[in-house]
Amino acid sequence: MQIKDLIYKVSLISVSGRTDVDVTAICFDSRKVEKGSMFIAVRGVSSDGHSFIADVIQKGATAVVCEELPEIESTADCTIIQVKDSAEALGMIASNFYDSPSSKLKLVGVTGTNGKTTTVTLLYRLFRKLGYKTGLLSTVENIIEDKVVQATHTTPDAISLNKLLADMVKAGCTHCFMEVSSHAAVQRRIAGLQFAGGLFSNITHDHLDYHKTFDEYIKAKKLFFDGLPNDSFALINSDDKRGRVMIQNTRAKTYTYSLLALADFKGKLISTTMQGLEMDVDGIQAWFRLIGNFNAYNLLAVYATAVLLGEDKEEVLMQLSTIEAANGRFEQQISATRITVIVDYAHTPDALKNVLETITELKGANKIITVVGCGGNRDAAKRPVMADIACQFSDHVVLTSDNPRNEEPQAILTEMEKGVRIVDKKKVLSVLDRKEAIKVACTLASTGDIILVAGKGHETYQEIKGVKYPFDDRLIIKELLDTLGK
């Protein structure tokens, strides 16, 4: 593909050099540049691609895309393209390089603090059951029809993302459902993608380590809807007071869903048990295998999205009633002595509260024992809040490590302990080692009790000082219950 084809629709400031030259590869990592490559100089969190322009020209790059022109004597035969926003240009160029794969799919993006993974996973499974070849891009995994590609971020970088979408098109997929994180919107990783629709679930306290203020976080989520085309749909949870903010400037056709008020798609939770929930959806009663009020919202969002994509209401509900939750989302193990252990990815205050409220409604006279930690190098303000919420709903709380990353685990625990009120101190233990913490919870539990192990969900590792060690809450729980004879 030639340079002129790659910069189609890119907002250009200047072009110095030929544009009728072939490009064999595109990259934003200077280490991957080879002769014939186009290098896009992107400003990252820890490094600036502009610092490596001289290096990539020496390596034989055919073209360089940048915001600031390089201060070097000679650019050889390299075409220099100046743009206003190189991160946005990267998205557009990646889309052009892979022949605009998103335009050949019905691509739906899901954003919000909680529920993204469950929602996209349910949509993926639903559309498979409806007979479509479907792709999935999620925190847990990326799937091309039925081929799993492991995920490393909620939203991959623009080049990886377009390659995945191109592979989906090649595999015959007609639909793709993807999580869209606030980071991805701000970093322009979704620039150049053509969405058939966007879905907003809710917004609560998260990622303030990156966005700094809650207003900035809201604006980051809103960016996604601002960029939707006029032939797409924007579906919002109208029970979240910030839902309307998301669609203030969107060109998309807007729709709402709600459990509490009038909306385009209306649901009402009838009952919920540890086996599932019954809900009225647009006047039709149906039973689902998911649990809790928060999942009623996820199910309603999935139903509404499917209908907006042209599917039959009754067929959607019938197929949706057969689908189970995503891995690590309210995932249950029941021991020989009838102790229920729930593993959930809840790693924000709101998500933890939702899960514990659901367990409280269903527990009867039995105890709730919560094991919870907070990740390192992430929003520290939520740490005492998470501990406080765990105490409010639990009979025993074991504070522990999550993914400490590059922070000291004890320092994170100390910050969590600040959220424990004097009246709750007797019910709280701090156990630094996560496996030991789960063991303590299992030891405290008796027949009928419920243990919640929160924070990591589907993850199969624990990240400490830059190293990911094998660690799966679900396997640890099974091992400990068997060892303890519980």
Curated annotation (Swiss-Prot):
Catalyzes the addition of meso-diaminopimelic acid to the nucleotide precursor UDP-N-acetylmuramoyl-L-alanyl-D-glutamate (UMAG) in the biosynthesis of bacterial cell-wall peptidoglycan. Its cofactor is Mg(2+). Its EC number is 6.3.2.13. Carboxylation is probably crucial for Mg(2+) binding and, consequently, for the gamma-phosphate positioning of ATP. This is UDP-N-acetylmuramoyl-L-alanyl-D-glutamate--2,6-diaminopimelate ligase. Pfam families: Mur_ligase, Mur_ligase_C, Mur_ligase_M. ATP binds at residues 112-118. The modification N6-carboxylysine is found at residue 221. Keywords: ATP-binding, Cell cycle, Cell division, Cell shape, Cell wall biogenesis/degradation, Cytoplasm, Ligase, Magnesium, Nucleotide-binding, Peptidoglycan synthesis. One of its GO terms (biological process) is cell wall organization. It comes from Cytophaga hutchinsonii (strain ATCC 33406 / DSM 1761 / CIP 103989 / NBRC 15051 / NCIMB 9469 / D465). Gene3D superfamilies: Mur ligase, C-terminal domain, Mur-like, catalytic domain, MurE/MurF, N-terminal domain. One of its GO terms (cellular component) is cytoplasm. Pathway: Cell wall biogenesis; peptidoglycan biosynthesis. It is an enzyme of class 6 (ligase). The gene is murE. The lineage of its organism: Bacteria, Pseudomonadati, Bacteroidota, Cytophagia, Cytophagales.
